[in-house]
Amino acid sequence: MIRILLSLLTLTSLLLSFACNNIGGGDKVRVGVFMSMTGSTANFGISSTNGIKMAADEVNAAGGINGKQIELLVQDDRSDASEAATIVTKFVTQDQVHAILGEVASSRSIAAAPIAQNAKIPMLTPSSTNPEVTRKGNFIFRSCFIDPVQGAAIAQFAARTLGAKRAAIMVDRKNDYSTGLEKVISATFTKMGGQMVGTQSYQEGDQDFNAQLTDLKGKNPEVIFVPGYYNDVGLIAKQARDKGITVPLVGGDGWDSAQLYAIGGTALNGSFFTNHYSPYDTDPKVQKFVNDYKARYGTIPDALAATAYDAAKIMFDAIKRATSLDGTAIRDALAATKDYPGVTGNVTFNENRDAVKPIVMIEIKPGGTYSVRERVNVEGAALAATAPAAPATAASPATK
């Protein structure tokens, strides 16, 4: 009798579990969000979380997903890869989330992706650009461009638009994002007839770059690539100018933070970086997002706020189109996403689950203003020329 009762209880438990995962069962859509709310990339994590929360609130206010409200389970990984893995493990083993959004940094997404993949829970990163992220499995997606595309755009811009023939590069050897970009930038610049005359390395959090910059200055580069994060780039720019290095600095989307100019100041004038969008784009869709974000958070949204907002909306749209809350059904709906009208551009996932979308090249001008120097599509063709200068984005407030 006891065995029969236990069997019945087990069967009941399984049926209830199925009911909760079926589109008609349960009353919440549970989405795990892991971001760097503190630590070295806190600015990125905070603005990304802001974008995700705003997207969820908009969908919930409109009735939710197929009548169900979205429940965000937001966790701070403290900018640490091992903590990111721990959080995602909890998401899939204890919280039983239906989908996962995160992380901002490639190294942390790479640490977490195998866990989501093994659990067959779809994970969508809004801003991890290292190609290795989506290679972790067919449940892993990204809604941003990838480093080979971004790196090629950076190198092409230096060679074609700036006319540089000699280049040097500063790379964070312990950062997947930085090393991934370095390889593509160097290879593309060389392929286009340029010469890489010097390479120097540093580690995130370093304060003194004088030895590396002294070496690079002696190589007489016409441009210096710095594929790193804003907190290091600002210091590198200041110390480069102090050493009399006047050539343009060029980097990637890791530069995008108001803290960049707060750290580097006028040393950044005449520098350039690739990005996912511009908050000064006149597209009504972009301006609505910017105005809504400003009204809610009191600041202009940076690119990672926009990519995270898009990622959340894309995930919610896929869940709506899925036949159930089963992970495979959501994964299949995500993979079928085509021309989703995001604020960072129309998004389509290719066969590698990477987003196909445009890139903008931002120029930093005196007074901390930004302008769009040109737009580049995934094939690398220039789409548009200069746009009017506009103020740099303000720092995002801490999320409550």
Language model regions located:
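Extracytoplasmic "Venus flytrap"
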Residues: 32-53, 75-82, 104-105, 170-179, ...
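Extracellular/periplasmic bilobed ligand-binding domains
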Residues: 116, 182-274, 384-385, 389-399
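Segments of small-molecule ligand-sensing domains
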Residues: 295-305, 316-370, 392, 397-400
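Extracellular/periplasmic periplasmic-binding protein-like sensory domains
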Residues: 237-309, 320, 325, 364, ...
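Short, low-complexity disordered leader/linker segments with a strong preference
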Residues: 1-30, 61, 379-400
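An alpha-beta-alpha
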Residues: 37, 140-204, 223, 315
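Hydrophobic alpha-helical segments within soluble ligand-binding/sensing domains
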Residues: 84, 143-166, 179-181, 207-210, ...
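Beta-alpha junction/loop-to-helix N-cap segments that form part of ligand/metal-binding clefts
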Residues: 21-23, 27-28, 43-48, 58, ...
